[in-house]
């Protein structure tokens, strides 16, 4: 039993993508010289650029969570909060701060709910770092520390890195998915976006020589 527990579980065979193959220029845009957001360790990166204040992102989130749960181990999902300025800025800082302080998983959906459903977090006028810190304090962190971390050098670095990736990927709206830094998905809706991403992931997998026995 111990030996079985220590042996790596066999990787699930990737599910063949559904629907028609995507068309370059219509379903996705090739990013010239595109690179993943961060080192992938040989995995296929899927970056979702989103904003907490974006209603479409709030609606997309449950679909993304379900989609993520079905991805095989060779897919690396990365969420990036877009620092587009205005009310995007404080909530992007909050995202990267929550990530840094280890409370992102338990707060991610809660922030969407607080902005779009409960209206307990403001959009206009802009929330202060202290207001945002007070919100996150309900999830087990020190609110004052959270607020000060939002303005820290480390978070500035994350904001800058995200901005650079978003700019070089040509992303100007949310939610947007970028596959392996090479393809910006331009689907006509949420399900269409995920379908296109599935095809592009399969394409990248095949290009890496990771095609399955079934030829997918």
Predicted regions and their residues:
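C-terminal cap of thioredoxin/glutaredoxin-like
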Residues: 1, 137-216
